[in-house]
Amino acid sequence: MISSIFAMLPNGSIGHKNSLPWKGQKYKEIARRDMEHFKNVTEGKSVVMGYNTFESLNFKPLKNRLNHFIITSRDLPLNLPDNVIKINICDFIDKFKDSEEEVVCIGGSMLYDTLLKYSKVVYRSIFYIEE
């Protein structure tokens, strides 16, 4: 089963320049709670990510998860850890759309655009912050 997890601002923004758009003191506590939620949802499961998300993690997999990295035409980093599986998007969808195993899409936006229609569960957080 494919699922997706993301947090967003009320304007729909989920990222900015390969980073999260909520930074600074006013977002500190809610961002901490949302990262805790992210960890609780994804830990012990498989996750799937695109190139920019993997790059934002400095090409290091998330701990305590099997990491699927979607192959595109971009150059791939060499010597990836054993818990990173390289797979193309069509093979990924075929393998997991009807699987009992939950694989959580963690971004980025292009991968969400492709996988949301296959996601049986969507974990969405919206950050409402008073200015």
Place the predicted regions along the sequence by residue.
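N-terminal nucleotide/polyanion-binding subdomain common to many enzyme families
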Residues: 1-101, 111-124, 129
